[in-house]
Structures are given as structure tokens and as C-alpha cells.
Regions:
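N-terminal lobe of the biotin/lipoate ligase/transferase fold
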Residues: 1-88, 109-114
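Long, positively charged amphipathic alpha-helical accessory segments at protein N-termini or as interdomain linkers
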Residues: 63-65, 69-95, 105-164
């Protein structure tokens, strides 16, 4: 595995997709402190201020294109389990995979199923004989609050973790 940590990039996905096109080996991970052009599924904007975890992974799985939906599920479940392990016990059951590409926080007392808060977005892009797996996790709130559009109200992992 090769980890590259960058300060500020347009998109970690674009860096990994370029590496895929160049024939780079599986295992490259690109992480950025901030992204100016982060995006999710169907080109939706992923706000990426300092305080989150934004990374992309280069994979070359030995599966047919139809197997990518299974890969998406496996990645989603792995991220969900990792976030649950970091959360206080009372918050763990509320961290859920929202198919096909989100990890959300939906406590039992949530009045409606569509009133969840978004913890993480995951994207899968086939490119250059491989797959770019993009993961964006809301860890800490930004220093300057950002306006929230649509239903993607963020939930920050720091609020669900033990302090100290």
C-alpha cells in the first residue's frame, strides 16, 4: 500500500483515476485535508472543508463489472463497522448503511426515516481497468458553518465519539 497525504486538492478521486489510467498498481491511497472539487455519486457536490477525512483508494479487483455493486456493499459495510467501533456504545446502532453509497446517523427516536444525518459518502468509479473508491467522512465540523442544501444534513463523527 502507498499512502499519499496532500493538503488541498480538487479531488482525490481524480488523482486516483489518473493513476488508474497510467496503469499504477493496486493499493494507492490518496488522502487530502481539503478538497475544492469533491464529488459523490452522479456528480453531486461533496463539501470537503478541513476537518473531514477525504480519501480515494485504487483497486484492481478480479471481478466482472456486474460485481462492482457487491464491492460497493462490502466497502459500505466495512466503513460502517469502522465508524461503529469508534462511536460511543449508545450511538452505534444508529450508524447505518443507506444503500447504495451513504453511511447515515439515524437514532431510534428519529421521527421519520428520511430525517437522517449524513456521516459518510462513498463513491465507486470504474476507470482504466480498475476501480476508484472514494470515501468522505464528516469528522469535525468546519470552523465556519456552511449552508446545508437538500437533505444531506451532516453528522460529525467527533460528536459520536468518547472524548478525552
Amino acid at each position: 500500500m502507498k499512502l499519499t497525504i496532500l493538503d488541498d486538492v480538487a479531488s482525490t478521486n481524480e488523482i486516483v483515476k489518473n493513476a488508474l489510467r497510467e496503469g499504477k498498481a493496486e493499493g494507492l491511497v490518496v488522502r487530502a485535508r481539503r478538497q475544492s472539487g469533491g464529488y459523490g455519486r452522479q456528480g453531486r457536490i461533496w463539501d470537503s472543508p478541513v476537518g473531514g477525512l477525504y480519501m480515494s483508494l485504487l483497486l484492481r479487483p478480479d471481478v466482472a463489472g456486474s460485481g462492482l455493486s457487491t464491492l460497493s456493499l462490502v466497502v459500505g459495510l466495512a466503513v460502517q463497522r469502522a465508524l461503529e467501533a469508534l462511536a460511543v456504545p449508545a450511538a452505534r446502532d444508529a450508524i447505518q448503511l443507506k444503500w447504495p453509497n451513504d453511511i447515515v446517523y439515524m437514532p431510534a427516536d428519529c421521527p421519520r426515516a428520511d430525517e437522517y444525518r449524513k456521516l459518510c459518502g462513498i463513491s465507486m468509479e470504474a476507470c482504466g481497468g480498475g476501480v476508484c473508491v472514494g470515501i468522505g467522512i464528516n469528522v469535525f465540523p468546519p470552523e465556519i458553518a456552511q449552508p446545508v442544501e437538500g437533505r444531506n444534513i451532516p453528522q460529525y463523527m467527533a460528536d459520536l465519539m468518547l472524548s478525552g
